[in-house]
Amino acid sequence: VPELHRNVVKVIEAGRSLGVVVEPRSYPQGAKTAQDAADAIGVAVGQIVKSLIFGVATSDDDVELVMAYVSGSNLLDEKKLAAAAGATKCQRVDADAVRQSTGYPIGGVPPFGHDNELRIFIDPDLLTHPEVWAAAGTWNDVFPIAPDVLATSSGGSIVDLKRD
């Protein structure tokens, strides 16, 4: 059995502290896109949780980082995310900001176990599946989770984020 990456261990431990069993599966070729991940796992692309981090700007130009969990079959509507966060606009942040705020690389951000607490917004389309798959700390590692457990364990708010 190959040794687990330290990020995966961190996700397993964070899950345990929340009462969530994390059983990671590794895909050495990686899962750079939601479709790649779905194909590797053998599930519908809508069952892949895309963890997206944005900076939302309030009227006084303070920028807060927030996270959106979006179904792999949907595109995020940035205006909807900004509105949900009570902000005027939002923008993507770079890889360094993602790693600094969560402790994980882009493509590997799990639903919990982040270095800093971020507000989380969840695409309701994820809740239509019996099981969804989220990153487990690296580009190559994912784990299955029931969508209601994803919502409660992450403390996220369910809000329409889908680009129409």
Which residues make up each language-model segment?
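Extended, low-hydrophobicity, polar/charged segments
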Residues: V1-D164
